[in-house]
């Protein structure tokens, strides 16, 4: 049976820490390997991306493999044929599927019916590669994650969901602020709390950010939600990370954003360009974390 990375929970506690440590080691040593030598990874992107495509293509090459990239027009996941058929066919041609799509159910079906590893490069429900990369970005600076307080300010979107998942395996405190009606997945939150995750929810961004060591946000309208832009701008009034709000965090706090950022909406230009901003380190760490994840799915 192939190993999949469809969500952070696929790693389990031991796997999550193993991948985190391995990603740091790969970064520190400039690792190049042969794990994917002779293997072909199919990148299936229904949602366009700059960082995700480049970082995954480079990651595969650093591990000795090659890639085939399928555009949204070419992939047609579930439109021209059943997903289960697509999964079986691609499994006969290539060695791994790296999928960036809308519904999580598509990722899960590809994993269920294919015979090769499936890696979640983003869905509407989760962004596990990004959040694992963000944990790496914190871990580099604060190896004792039990001393870390993370603030999430904004939408209860796929990023928020994956942060909740990460809190199940890593011992940081997670304070999250959302406007009413924009909460994260309730069932996932329940699972995390039952697992002992230290997660606290509020409507007040000031309360969530007070004393935080790492301050996170994301766009207010994700891909596919453009028609909701005006309504969301009104709902998220007061949730913009500006100098005043950032000033409530820990004196040495760092600002994080998965990018692309809508400057002037969820974050000001002042904060993005400040010494507190570590968004470019986050972007780089996608490469190292994805190499570690690919190695994990291909290692018994």
From Swiss-Prot:
An example molecular function term from Gene Ontology annotations: amino acid binding
Record-linked PROSITE patterns: CARBAMOYLTRANSFERASE
Main location group: cytoplasm
Keyword Chloroplast assigned: no
Protein name per UniProt: Ornithine carbamoyltransferase
Keywords tagged on the record: Amino-acid biosynthesis, Arginine biosynthesis, Cytoplasm, Transferase
GO cellular component: cytoplasm
Binding site for L-ornithine: 158, 218, 222-223
Pfam families, sorted: OTCace, OTCace_N
Gene: argF
Compartmental location: Cytoplasm
